[in-house]
Regions:
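N-terminal, positively charged/glycine-rich alpha-helical extensions of SAM-dependent methyltransferases
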Residues: 1-19
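Structured loop/turn residues at beta-strand edges in well-structured enzyme cores
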Residues: 48, 93, 111
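Conserved alpha-helix/loop element of class I SAM-dependent methyltransferases that forms part
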Residues: 29-46
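Class I SAM-dependent methyltransferase Rossmann-like catalytic core
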Residues: 22-26
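Alpha-helical elements of Rossmann-like donor-binding domains used by nucleotide-donor carbohydrate transfer enzymes
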Residues: 10, 34-38, 83
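A short acidic, Gly/Pro-enriched loop at the edge of an enzyme's catalytic core
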Residues: 107-116
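Conserved class I S-adenosyl-L-methionine
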Residues: 48-54
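Class I SAM-dependent methyltransferase SAM/SAH-binding core
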Residues: 51, 59-104
Length: 117
């Protein structure tokens, strides 16, 4: 997969703001409940194995975890993944975060997922 290094760097520079509901990611905080509800209306997440591709700081990832899913978040931004890990640890969430490309992860893994976001 081709990744634009400047795009990755842009998100690395602002990744620590993921959980600031009034910061640069404020629109995601507004729509996240809608995204989460849409997904949970389509599939019962309880007990499902979910992968959240391009998870960023983990907003949707954690929402799906709260619905009972076992969630793996993957993102190319190492800073965003670190931010997501720290936030999950603070909340005692058992979420797996992986820094990398989803395509490579899926090619290298024998794990399967019930839901892909």
């Amino acid at each position: 997969m081709n990744i634009d290094p400047s795009e990755k760097e842009k998100f690395n520079q602002i990744a620590e703001e993921w959980w600031d509901a009034t910061g640069k990611f404020a629109p995601l905080h507004v729509i996240n409940p809608l995204r989460s509800k849409y997904i949970s209306d389509k599939v019962d997440l309880n007990g499902k194995n979910v992968i959240d591709v391009a998870c960023g700081g983990g907003l949707l990832t954690e929402s799906m975890h709260e619905c009972g899913a076992t969630v793996t978040g993957v993102d190319i931004s190492d800073v965003a993944i670190n931010t997501a890990k720290i936030h999950a640890e603070k909340n005692n969430y058992n979420v797996t975060y992986i820094n990398g490309e989803a395509e490579e992860l899926l090619n290298d893994s024998k794990e399967t997922f019930d839901v892909v976001t």
